[in-house]
Design a protein with these regions (language model features):
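Membrane-helix boundary/juxtamembrane motif in polytopic membrane proteins
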Residues: 261-270
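Extreme N-terminal basic, low-complexity initiation segments
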Residues: 2-12
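Compositionally biased, low-complexity intrinsically disordered regions
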Residues: 4-5, 25, 37
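A generic, lipid-embedded transmembrane alpha helix
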Residues: 83-98, 119-120, 145-153
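Short hydrophobic targeting helices and cationic amphipathic motifs
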Residues: 17-19, 23-24, 29, 40
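Alpha-helical transmembrane segments of multi-pass small-molecule/ion transporters
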Residues: 44-63, 72-76, 103-255, 264-265, ...
Length: 357
């Protein structure tokens, strides 16, 4: 009578029973059977993390904020992490640009500027159904612009899976901040003599985010891969840890915005969920015109789907002070940002795969 070997599978109270054939040794059989048991669908589900670890940090911060924990990061640390992430992204993009011709970049920049303008106009058209002109314009500008944190999570998501992407995406990140802001201002109040264009230009083109990104790219481009190599332990190896801490603080911030979102109704909630999906689709079409790779398409869709919560609010406070910042920030931070980093990026990647097949 053949020997019965019992292997326990976690989701069953009773053991599975396997019968080895006459051509397998006991050790070979056990190795094969363990592989089969570990590859059981339920076991795979249990062993495979559904969310990236940095997203779990975000969820931890969100939960801590919702239960009104006293957890908080020092403001100086949050600012330092922002600076670090922007520089790291800029350096990586600059090194990539140093290894390719810059001439094909000009038509691509024109396309991403067009993308930001179209998103802002489309968002304004929808929001105008329920909002005042200035609130609709200010909120639309947030959704026509981009989020560095969402981009950083997208970069990490692709890197973890060994998916390459074009280096010029870092330049797109810097450039896409600008057209949405300018279009949003014009939609809100037109071209007026009262508009403080010099101050707005300084805030738009020389804001912290754009300056750090462009500065990092310039350093990476001039230094090249060999020059940046000594900085790898800081800007490459520590990138994921810095992103995790940054997202922990973002979770705490989002928890506060979730409470504000309840006051603004289902219309804003629906817009905050559907606008990223429509923008991602538009981004994929633009990316296909550029001839981007699978990773590049995924990142451009992620950029298009993201919404600004730093550069645009700061500029709109100057240009359109009568707009209600609570409307846009509660939608961006309470809905769009968590949706993108938890569900959106894998979804946009699956859409991008269909575009490349």
């Amino acid at each position: 009578m053949p020997e019965v070997i019992e292997l326990f599978v976690v989701e069953h109270r009773a053991p599975y029973q396997f019968l080895p054939n006459n051509h397998q040794s006991k050790s070979d059989f056990i190795e094969t059977s363990c592989t089969l048991a570990c590859n059981h669908p339920v076991n795979c589900l249990l062993r495979t993390p559904m969310l990236d670890v940095v997203v779990l940090f975000f969820l931890f911060g969100l939960l801590a904020g919702l239960v009104r924990s006293e957890l908080k990061l020092p403001p100086a640390l949050y600012d330092t992490l922002s600076l670090f992430l922007l520089l790291a992204i800029g350096l990586k993009g600059g090194v990539g640009l140093a290894q390719q011709s810059l001439q094909p970049l000009l038509p691509q920049l024109a396309l991403v500027i067009l993308l930001g303008m179209l998103q802002t106009l489309a968002g304004f058209t929808v929001l105008r159904l329920k909002m005042s002109r200035v609130d609709a314009a200010a909120t639309a500008a947030h959704y026509g612009s981009v989020s560095v944190a969402t981009f950083a999570v997208g970069v990490n998501w692709l890197t973890e899976r060994g998916i390459s992407f074009e280096s010029q995406l870092s330049i797109f990140l810097a450039v896409m901040e600008i057209p949405a802001i300018l279009v949003g201002i014009v939609l809100a109040q037109g071209v007026s003599r009262q508009t403080r264009w010099r101050r707005l230009a300084h805030e738009t083109f020389l804001g912290k985010g754009v300056t750090l990104l462009l500065g990092g790219m310039a350093i990476g481009y001039l230094a090249g891969p060999d020059g940046i190599a000594p900085l790898k332990p800081l800007f490459v190896d520590l990138f994921k840890g810095a992103l995790a801490l940054f997202l922990l603080e973002m979770g705490l911030i989002v928890a506060r915005q979730c409470q504000d979102l309840r006051r603004h109704g289902l219309f804003l909630l629906g817009f905050a969920l559907l606008m990223p999906l429509a923008s991602a689709g538009l981004g994929l079409m633009i990316g296909q015109l550029m001839g981007l790779s699978l990773g590049g398409l995924t990142l451009l869709a992620t950029l298009a789907a993201s919404a600004s919560y730093i550069a645009v609010p700061a500029t709109m406070r100057i240009a359109v002070p009568q707009a209600n910042p609570g409307l846009s920030l509660s939608a961006v931070l309470g809905v769009t940002f968590p949706f993108n980093i938890m569900l959106g990026i894998p979804l946009y990647h699956s859409w991008a795969r269909h575009f490349t097949e």
